[in-house]
Amino acid sequence: KNEQINKWEILDKWVEKYKEIDPDLLVTSSHATEKNLEMPFTVGNLKPRGGRLYADFMTPEFLDGTAHPRVYFAAGNCLIGNIDNDPESMAVAWLSGMDATSMIGYVVTTWYGRNGWGGLKYWVANAGRLTLAQAVYLNQQDMLRTENEWHPKMLTVNYPFSEIEFGQREMFEKQFKTVTGQQ
């Protein structure tokens, strides 16, 4: 059954399905920070408090952990894996209160997500043959191989994520173009 859900109801539906299914694997992709996961963008929020996650409804609804192993794969969520010395972070809540035994999440902003989605692809496509860590590692090796095929000197560039975020993107682009012979 293909049914359209109003964006204001997506978080409600997610919480309902989370409780109903008690999943072994959770995969998310939406805007996130160290302090929240928006589902969808700008509307519904999951937030951490006291090492647990709650749905930020009019009356906050805390989510329960699980009694079985759980993997949380934040394949397309910026910053959600960044603990930043804060026990009130999303990563701490997923690993403690939500009982994720493994978690993959970005500690930088991302708009492409090859590391997350590629790692998930390697893990799922090789189900039972690779550990989660091996799948992520092989994906990273594949990304390096691809960069080397595009232009070997790409591997010599330092990708300064924090500087790019703080308005120094032009400096990075100039360095990148110089190294790859585009300037």
Locations of regions flagged by a protein language model:
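Active-site-proximal C-terminal subdomain of hydrolase catalytic domains
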Residues: 71, 75-183
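Catalytic-core segments of thiol-dependent peptidases
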Residues: 1-88
